[in-house]
C-alpha cells in the first residue's frame, strides 16, 4: 500500500466520524435517529445514514488492518466495498438536495457533480495537508499534484455551469443566484467557496 493510500485509509474513518457527529443534530431527537436506521430504504436520509454507518465500519476495519500490519486475504474486497460506499457518500448530499423540487436552485444534476468533485478535491487537500504537516513538503505525494489542479479546474467549471444554468432556469433560482453572487451570502460564496475552496488550493498546488 502506498504512503498516500495509507494516509487516506487511516484518516477516512476519523474525518467521517466527525462529520457523522455533526449530522446528528439535524435529525433531532434520538428516536428519529433510531427510526432512520430501522427503515433503511424509507427515504434518501435513511439511505445516507446507512451509507455513513457502512463506510465507518469498512474504513475502520481497513485502517485497523493497516495500522496493525495484519495481512488479510479479504483486504482487496474491503477496498472494493469501501470504494463503492465512498462513491455513494460523495453523491448522497447532492442527490438529496437535487431531489427537492420545491427549491429551484438545488433542482439540478449539476449539484451532484459539484459535490463529487468537491469531495475528491477535499481528499487531495487532506493528503497534501498531512504531508506538509508531517514532512514539511508535499513532494512525497507528487502524484496528486496534477490531480489536484484538474479537480480544482473541473470544480470551477462545474460551479460556473451550475450558476449559469440556475440563472436562466427560473426567476426564483435567479434570485438565489443573486443572493450568492451579490447579496447576503456573497461574502461566504466569494471568500469561503471561491477563494478558500478553489483559488487558494489551486495556487498552493501550482507553486509547490
Placement of each model-derived feature along the sequence:
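Membrane helical hairpin/interfacial module
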Residues: 1-51, 55
Amino acid at each position: 500500500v502506498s504512503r498516500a493510500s495509507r494516509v487516506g485509509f487511516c484518516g477516512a474513518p476519523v474525518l467521517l466520524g466527525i462529520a457523522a457527529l455533526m449530522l446528528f443534530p439535524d435529525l433531532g431527537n434520538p428516536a428519529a435517529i433510531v427510526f432512520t436506521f430501522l427503515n433503511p430504504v424509507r427515504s434518501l436520509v435513511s439511505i445516507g445514514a446507512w451509507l455513513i454507518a457502512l463506510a465507518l465500519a469498512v474504513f475502520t476495519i481497513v485502517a485497523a488492518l493497516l495500522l496493525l500490519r495484519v495481512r488479510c486475504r479479504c483486504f482487496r474486497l474491503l477496498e472494493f466495498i469501501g470504494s463503492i460506499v465512498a462513491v455513494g457518500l460523495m453523491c448522497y448530499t447532492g442527490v438529496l438536495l437535487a431531489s427537492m423540487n420545491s427549491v429551484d436552485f438545488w433542482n439540478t444534476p449539476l449539484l451532484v457533480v459539484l459535490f463529487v468533485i468537491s469531495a475528491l478535491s477535499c481528499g487531495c487537500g487532506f493528503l497534501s495537508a498531512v504531508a506538509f504537516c508531517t514532512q514539511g513538503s508535499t513532494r512525497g505525494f507528487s502524484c496528486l499534484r496534477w490531480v489536484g489542479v484538474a479537480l480544482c479546474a473541473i470544480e470551477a467549471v462545474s460551479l460556473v455551469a451550475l450558476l449559469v444554468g440556475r440563472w436562466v432556469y427560473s426567476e426564483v433560482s435567479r434570485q438565489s443566484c443573486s443572493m450568492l453572487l451579490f447579496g447576503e451570502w456573497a461574502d461566504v460564496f466569494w471568500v469561503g467557496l471561491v477563494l478558500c475552496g478553489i483559488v487558494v488550493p489551486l495556487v498552493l498546488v501550482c507553486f509547490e
